[in-house]
């Protein structure tokens, strides 16, 4: 009996300060505001459309924050769709990535997974003490039959997991979904979509440019909510 009580007491002490869905509410409110306030426009990029999110996607993902913007760069003669979606529970993101979602809407995956790549962006580029952030990503190529010709797109995709950083693969999201310490803070998926006719090098430039503009958001989405250096960490139970 004494041993049972000791085990129970130890479990209680170990878990009573663990994050929960309720304690993470302030964190998700902060993330939603950050996503909604994000400005990716630069001197060369302007928002030309904000397409609505299909109700089916809303129901499946149950997003806490979602932003979709179509941007145009006249200097490059390029256009891109920039999407950020963040869920409250990592498990809601575990099955949602391009090879699963796009074929359900008539897109055909053109090839097997390509090796993940990465770009490096500067944080606080105007500062003399500017640091850098590595953004890994996976490139997916899809085509959709149509008349008079088929459509082709390229998707630059990755995930942000609080406390675990930026990752290019769905397996990392699934592993995070198994961790009750990470699960209440959810996960985010970021996609940059360009026309399939855009050269790979130009597509990479477009992706890097938009990630540079999104640096503060990427840091917010990937830092550990339990390790915020000042004040009380967002979402930590008291």
Task: State what each model feature region is.
Residues 1-14:
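Hydrophobic membrane-insertion alpha-helices, especially the h-region
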Residues 2-3, 28, 38, 183, ...:
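Active-site-proximal structural scaffolding
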Residues 17-34:
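Alpha-helical transmembrane signal-anchor/signal-peptide segments
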Residues 31-61:
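Short extracytoplasmic
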Residues 65-226:
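A cross-kingdom signal targeting lumenal/periplasmic-facing segments of multi-pass membrane
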Residues 224-238:
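Short, highly charged C-terminal tails/helix-capping segments
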């Amino acid at each position: 009996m004494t041993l049972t009580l000791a085990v129970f007491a130890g479990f209680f002490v170990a878990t009573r300060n663990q994050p929960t869905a309720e304690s993470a509410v302030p964190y998700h409110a902060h993330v939603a505001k950050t996503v909604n306030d994000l400005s990716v426009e630069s001197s060369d990029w302007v928002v030309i459309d904000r397409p609505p999110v299909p109700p089916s996607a809303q129901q499946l993902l149950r997003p806490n924050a979602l932003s979709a913007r179509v941007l145009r760069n006249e200097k490059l003669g390029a256009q891109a769709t920039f999407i950020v979606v963040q869920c409250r529970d990592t498990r809601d993101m575990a099955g949602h990535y391009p090879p699963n979602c796009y074929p359900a809407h008539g897109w055909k995956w053109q090839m097997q997974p390509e090796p993940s790549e990465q770009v490096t962006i500067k944080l606080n580029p105007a500062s003399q003490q500017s640091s850098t952030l590595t953004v890994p990503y996976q490139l997916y190529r899809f085509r959709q039959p149509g008349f008079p010709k088929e459509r082709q797109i390229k998707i630059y995709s990755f995930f942000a997991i609080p406390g675990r950083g930026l990752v290019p693969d769905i397996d990392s999201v699934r592993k995070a979904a198994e961790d009750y310490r990470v699960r209440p803070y959810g996960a985010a998926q970021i996609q940059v979509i360009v026309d399939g006719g855009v050269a790979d090098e130009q597509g990479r430039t477009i992706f890097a440019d938009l990630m540079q503009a999104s640096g503060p958001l990427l840091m917010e989405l990937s830092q550990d909510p339990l390790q915020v250096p000042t004040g009380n960490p967002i979402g930590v139970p008291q």
